[in-house]
């Protein structure tokens, strides 16, 4: 088993080396792709846009992003995936040969296990939701037209172009091996496809959101404690990241498994609070919500305020405080974009004339 994995990892190292040597001019592009593919953009950019354009799509997008990333965490704890940037330095596979030179970048040194790729899984799930939802909106109940078929081809070509760029980016940056990004894409699509058949998320009560959040958090912590009790160190990757990362400042605590867990459950709990609040019912369920200028205003204000909010980084000196603040910050994102911002704008704009609806 280990010998087979070493061969697979060596193929990944050679792939990374090939990309870094032959596509040096694309370095900035691959870094940009990796930054854009971060799941944070699904929460801070894509969610407020889709929620105020098509509420059901926004809700499904957030559920897919959260549950997909939670499953990604569990998979990583089970699979114990290596990362190229530390494996190439840590392995004795190259004992009788020269070690391939692998460059590191500011976004390379993530601290969690590597399989499956979180960037690939998150992007695949979120973009799958957007593509399938867009196609369902334009198709209607009639027989597909020529224009619809063209749109179908264009959107799916765009989808796979995005996935290819994300996968190549993660390999180029030495953050993942090829088999890890492929596993991420397939897993993300599977999660998104599953949520196409789940209707209960659109009218879930606050109690249901609370219990699901509690289950996700307690299961992950319980699973961690169980494996730890069996002698398995699930934070083994943190030591490797700190040891083999080229620069200490490139190792960020917000990429640890528990940071990801708290962000996800915080986001889902915040969505539950927002959708079951009186501010949401007054602003997003009345006649004003049908007025396009109002919805557009909600999108613009949400994007601006969430961008400013995202720039506020919780202090990371004390891990417990960092995790608690990460949970609160994540919960505030859907709470602001779903209820607080629309409520305030509704008070400012007032009720529109019926002719303008």
Swiss-Prot record:
Q: Where in the cell is it found?
A: Endoplasmic reticulum membrane
- Motif Prevents secretion from ER is found at 354-357
**Keyword tags:** Endoplasmic reticulum, Gluconeogenesis, Glycoprotein, Hydrolase, Membrane, Transmembrane, Transmembrane helix
Which residues are recorded as binding substrate? Answer: 83, 170
Pfam hit, one: PAP2
Keyword Glycoprotein assigned: yes
Q: Which Gene3D superfamilies does the entry mention?
A: Phosphatidic acid phosphatase type 2/haloperoxidase (1.20.144.10)
Q: Which residues lie on this side of the membrane: Lumenal?
A: 1-28, 82-117, 169-170, 231-254, 313-320
| TM region(s), chain numbering | 29-49, 61-81, 118-138, 148-168, 171-191, 210-230, 255-275, 292-312, 321-341
Q: Keyword Phosphoprotein: yes or no?
A: no
Residues at the catalytic site: 119 (proton donor), 176 (nucleophile)
What Gene Ontology molecular-function terms does this entry list? Answer: glucose-6-phosphatase activity; phosphate ion binding; phosphotransferase activity, alcohol group as acceptor
- UniProt-annotated glycosylation sites, renumbered to this chain: 96
Q: What is its EC number?
A: 3.1.3.9
Cytoplasmic side, ranges: 50-60, 139-147, 192-209, 276-291, 342-357
SMART domains from the xrefs?
A: acidPPc (SM00014)
Q: Quick one: a GO biological-process term for this protein?
A: glucose homeostasis
Catalytic reaction equation(s)? D-glucose 6-phosphate + H2O = D-glucose + phosphate
Question: Mainly localized where?
Answer: endoplasmic reticulum
**Kind of enzyme, top EC level?**
hydrolase
InterPro entries according to UniProt: Glucose-6-phosphatase, P_Acid_Pase_2/haloperoxi_sf, P_Acid_Pase_2/haloperoxidase
Pathway as given in its UniProt record? Carbohydrate biosynthesis; gluconeogenesis
Protein family per UniProt? Belongs to the glucose-6-phosphatase family.
What's this protein's function? Answer: Hydrolyzes glucose-6-phosphate to glucose in the endoplasmic reticulum. Forms with the glucose-6-phosphate transporter (SLC37A4/G6PT) the complex responsible for glucose production in the terminal step of glycogenolysis and gluconeogenesis. Hence, it is the key enzyme in homeostatic regulation of blood glucose levels.
Write the protein's name. Answer: Glucose-6-phosphatase catalytic subunit 1
Organism of derivation: Felis catus
**What gene makes this protein?**
G6PC1
